[in-house]
């Protein structure tokens, strides 16, 4: 794992987070939490063999949440200067003073704070030049278009890199953070046959570029998936078993996750309201939460509570 390439070190972000908490406490807050994040990356796209876009992004932000008993206030800024942080903490406190009390407001209990923060191997920067990214994107698109003569057009291929750093602290004494990366290659093409036109895509994404599928493999699969759609037709309405491919099956699970999320339950905006203890999915389905998978795209050593 390479050293992070950020404007601030993780230790500096953690000190800034602690400073936010001190400012909130001085303003009268009984509890507070702060998040500070940095991120930068690039995205290159090509279409029909020509470079279409070269984009760079760099962002940063501070988010402050304060509690005056059971009154809550929140404010954020993209300016990391000491004065901006002071103003943001003050704004959050001013908001909290005028909000209604909510019996469920507050930090998670202190004994629920993470004690050990494991290294999940989430940071693998990809020192990819723009020219190298363009070459990979062109290779990906070319591979897709060579799959079949019926592939007549392209929506493009892209190569992206991203690095981020995050720190979180709260008034229970917790202060932690980590760096992450995410790399990706994608392609989408269009195929025609008679009066039928179909499009499909494929992509690969990973924490480390070494774990990505090759650009040629991504393009080839995008082309094969597109051609496979040609000749498709409606079927009659029927009650039959349905087999979903992996990329669609995960979407079905996301509906369940959304339905049982705390926010939706609190707002009573879920179809699973009052379903605690009830069977809501097929008995052969088991869902496990594994937040500590090494290099996992959704892995995290701790959450924001």
Predicted features by range, described:
Residues 1-304:
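Active-site bordering "gate/hinge" segments
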